[in-house]
A protein has these predicted regions:
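Non-catalytic interaction-recognition regions
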Residues: 1-222
Length: 222
């Protein structure tokens, strides 16, 4: 890059970061069923098809095009997150069932958590069209405290991922944040909260969680 003039040494420095290999369940480099080299196009298609089957079984009133669009987007997130959530220099096992699961430390789980927030915000806006953003009140429960503290660790997680050339640090952070969110939601029914100030605080809190998750997946490239 220096020799071709693409990079100016005085303005930018390059650093080599080694990456491990994606292996099959047998611990050997991942291959197709016929033993050939696994092409990215084939991998993307396989994961997208796996996600599609799951979406189809719970698709409700979604059209074929909508289900396929969701499968493609979530499938790409599954692969990128699955790859980046591992330590860069280590080999890892590609398990399509684990990578495409909507539970656990996976891309689909992160996407699901974001969709859950958007659904709550949409319902809240429909029920309270004139509502304004509230002040985030001091937390009163452990789950609320855990979520607030997790949000406070965002800058630290980004800095660690950058300085250590380790995107897995950011992946682990958003997984922890998503867990805190879902545990908080399981304990606090936002739509049925009778205290308007608390309800506004909860909505502002999860809106901030969504913003952090969206920023994080943008930084991770999906």
């Amino acid at each position: 890059a220096y020799k071709t003039g693409l990079i100016d040494k005085e303005k930018c420095s390059l650093e080599f970061v080694g990456f491990g290999t994606m292996n099959g369940k047998d611990g050997k480099p991942f291959k197709t069923r016929d033993g050939g080299v696994m092409r990215l196009e084939y991998l993307l298609g396989s994961v997208s098809d796996a996600i599609y089957k799951k979406v189809e079984s719970n698709g409700g009133n979604l059209t074929e095009a909508e289900m396929r669009d969701i499968a493609d987007k979530v499938g790409l997130a599954a692969i990128k997150y699955g790859d980046l959530s591992n330590q860069p220099y280590k080999d890892y096992i590609f398990d399509i069932d684990r990578f495409t699961a909507f539970e656990g430390n996976t891309g689909p789980y992160i996407m699901y958590s974001m969709v859950r927030i958007k659904s709550i915000l949409t319902r809240f806006q429909a029920a309270y069209p004139d509502a304004k953003l509230g002040t985030i009140l001091p937390p009163e429960s452990k789950k609320e405290t855990d979520l607030a503290l997790a949000l406070c660790r965002f800058n630290e997680a980004v800095e660690e991922a950058y300085t250590q050339n380790a995107p897995n640090r950011l992946c682990h952070y958003i997984y922890d944040l998503a867990n805190c969110l879902n545990q908080f939601y399981g304990e606090h029914n936002i739509m049925k909260e009778s205290d308007a100030a608390k309800q506004a605080s909860y909505v502002t809190l999860i809106r901030l969680v969504l913003r952090v998750l969206e920023t994080s997946i943008h930084l991770l490239g999906f």
